[in-house]
UniProtKB/Swiss-Prot annotation:
Protein name: DNA-directed RNA polymerase subunit gamma
This protein's UniProt keywords: DNA-directed RNA polymerase, Magnesium, Metal-binding, Nucleotidyltransferase, Transcription, Transferase, Zinc
Record Gene3D superfamilies: 1.10.40.90, 2.40.40.20, RNA polymerase II, clamp domain, RNA polymerase Rpb1, domain 3
Organism: Synechococcus sp. (strain JA-3-3Ab)
Name of the encoding gene: rpoC1
Entry's cofactor comment: Binds 1 Mg(2+) ion per subunit.
Amino acid sequence: MAKTEQRFDYVKIGLASPERIIEWGQRTLPNGQVVGEVTKPETINYRTLKPEMDGLFCERIFGPVKDWECHCGKYKRVRHRGIVCERCGVEVTESRVRRHRMGYIKLAAPVTHVWYLKGIPSHIATLLDMPLRDVEQVVYFNAYVVVDPGNAPNLSYKQLLTEDQYLEIEDQMYEEGSELQLPENWAMIGAEAIERLLKDIDLEKEAEQLREEIASARGQKRARLIKRLRVIDNFIATGARPEWMVLRVLPVIPPDLRPMVQLDGGRFATSDLNDLYRRVINRNNRLARLQEIMAPEIIVRNEKRMLQEAVDALIDNGRRGRMVVGANNRPLKSLSDIIEGKQGRFRQNLLGKRVDYSGRSVIVVGPNLRMHQCGLPKEMAIELFQPFVIHKLIKRGIVNNIKAAKKLIQSNDPQVWDVLEDVIDGHPVLLNRAPTLHRLGIQAFEPILVEGRAIQLHPLVCPAFNADFDGDQMAVHVPLSLEAQAEARLLMLATNNILSPATGAPIITPSQDMVLGCYYLTADNPHAPDLGDRYFASLEDALIAYDRGVIGLHSKIWVRYSGPMELGKEEKESEPQIIEEPGGTRLKITNYRRIREDRDGNVISQYIRTTAGRIIFNKTVQDILSA
């Protein structure tokens, strides 16, 4: 298979001309035979289990089923590469060409593309400036549309006519002495009529006329004109023609993308697309045969409508009319179903691919972590960082080759954990929690090896991830290159993302357990024992007493303290009780402070009334501020 070396920036989905669709699937064999058109609804021969020629799995059109082997078996082996078998016409090549070689079906009558007819808004209806209901009446053979009114006074361009009205005007035209002159196809029905109307549109002229009308239009009419002009401008910009929204050639996707596989019991499982394509081919062939034998118009018209419905079901089953169902009344999966939605080709396979060097696990709280750290399970870390560990093991001379290194890792050798510690030191990892609704949904952390199988997350970063610990899962990704690691450290580290990019307000705010913990530490418990006679020489002494169980967390105690403190409203407003002591000193007593001063008013000592919990809280804050 030829690989393209051409780089591209994006994939654009647009309208394809009938010539382009034929070009996708048509090939000329060395003997001059042109292949590519699928004409038979058969898939495989149930006796030989080989694809039928010119069918939906034809080897001549799509390539051989087996590598380097033609259909009839005349040529086998790679040495016949590129030869086209003169007996069966199959090119001897790799079977994987069946993943990209396309075919096509030439339709016996044009059909509208259901996306452009029934999409919201309907581009065909917008472009023709007709109500969608009227366009549908024409497409599904319920009404005629006037495409050339001739000299008829009571007819106008794009006017809809019922069957009876159409026949009445036809009779008038052929009456003796009638002055009514109408061209042969003055009124048409079905997708042919829509194709004719679309062909008649001069895009440049129409765009110019619309711009003039928009200048003077107001309100609803102006909005409608702008919508129509936008569609026309897009057609002009892309170089597409409006009539391409009506299909004359239908592409057939490669057979390996709609496979047919044999099950154990000899039965076959097949993709729904094959059933939908088979319906189209059967109806198309029947229509071609009816046209050949000059069948009555009513029968031909009914077959054309059925062909239109079959193509609609193939492109987007259920978009219009009843859904086509298969066995067990299950709706068949159309081309649109394959590419749209969460399980579709784009979101599932192209945008959301699974990546190497990644893992996921349940998150649990890690209150002992620093904010820029996360707890990474050893089992996960050894798997994610395995190439780095192997490199380090060889570099240190612990092992000589990769195989020996892998064996050492599998045996859980203590040396491996030492090397792993060394490897992850300073190597950030990315944590992501789905859905990633803003950029803080993925942040970088320094990993700390932990036991168990859960990822430990600092509680402060939970609001950014919108995470909680009721079973949430998070994904881990390892940035490999030095550039990626530097970028993760400088831009994505949790400590660099304290403010919300949306509002500028802090997103790292204490909540839940942290607020409750701070409240519990500093709460004034009226039921706690009042140890008013307990005095401590320093904060450290009080903490030692708490650690030894001498005092409780909320026990009221007096502690000698000379540092800065903020007075509460009650303390500021209360008058101190002053006790004069022998030797000239005096004692000022309030509810929360006891201050001893010398005769000049200098503070000799100060005791404050507090609890062990408040001392712990204050010490923690002071330690962080002075760090």
